[in-house]
Amino acid sequence: MFIDSHYHFMAGMNEKAAAGMVGMIVHEARKMGMNPDYETMLKIAVQTWGDPLGDRLIDKMDEGGIDVTVAVNVDDFNIKQLTWEKMQAQNRILGEAVQRHPGRIISLAGIDPRRPEAADMTRVCLEEYGLRGIKYHPDHGFDPGGPESYKVLEVLAKNKGILLCHTSPLMPKGRCKFADPMLLADIAVDFPEIKVIAAHMGGYINWRPWASLAAFQSTMYGDTAVWDTLAFKNYKLFCRELREAIDLAGPTKILFGSDAPIQTLLYPMKTMVQFIQDLPKKAPADIHFTEEEVELILGGNARSVLGLADAFSNA
């Protein structure tokens, strides 16, 4: 079973909303030696990212060989026109997409803890909409281990929910100091019920702080989202960094994540999966991966974190 633990659900999309994300992807692509056309990518994003029913997601999952996807919303209190009511409507739509495609989608609500309504939004999402946890983007300007966040995490802990939290530097306007994995350190102490997935593992340049936590905290995990850009540009370096991350954090701590449909503007899901599948055969001669490690990354670890092991024990 293959599980994508990091997919961005978007109920709708317009050119203004897509522009920043496409700009980020173009920046990544140029670092990889690609020469993408911004206008073409923007057009594709506007035409294909909006997916209120989740039908496009399911089609892409089937095309890429993905059995289950963790679909997330993203909230940003800085966007004044994005009121809490509008954000909560997006979370409700995500919950409805899950019901439309039973067994295929696991959903995480977009919550910005700076909202006065954030804790109650979280409660409704978990207890009424059927979502399984929340997604944080602290690079929007908040401390994921701060007092505002803790009010939300209290609700999350009560419901034994999952926290997927962005950790990795971004281009401006991202406030990178808030995306440091070490800001998540106290959550394991104060909320041991919460399983934390550090999106990007802090990034393929700065993953060691994440690994230092994951090695000692049983509830700390990370995903591989955007690590595929390193694999594309320098597969040997990708293999070396991932090997060290596994050795230091442990083989059960890393989950496959795509960051689709944003990242799949560059190449299809199958390519991302293949980067991982090829590790035992295509890694440099002095770097070794086992088939068991590949199976854990592509699905086994996520099954455990998401509580799917029993439900899919016969899959």
Label the model's feature ranges.
Residues M10-M13, D76-I79, P113-E117, P169-K173, ...:
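Active-site environment of divalent metal-dependent phosphoester hydrolases
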Residues M13-A19, L82-T83, D120-T122, C176-K177, ...:
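Short aromatic-enriched loop/helix-cap "lid" or pocket-rim segments at secondary-structure transitions
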Residues D55-I58, N91-V98, T122-R123, S149, ...:
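Generic structural signal for well-ordered alpha-helices
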Residues D67-A179, D228-T229:
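Active-site gating/metal-coordination segments in enzymes
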Residues M1-I3, N14-E63, V68, R123-V124, ...:
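Mid-to-C-terminal alpha-helical segments outside catalytic/metal-binding sites
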Residues H6, M61, T69, L94, ...:
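Divalent metal-coordination and catalytic microenvironments
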Residues Q99-R104, D190-I194, F216-T219, A249, ...:
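Short helix-capping segments at alpha-helix termini
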Residues E128-G133, G141-F256:
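Catalytic pocket-lining loop regions of alpha/beta-barrel enzymes
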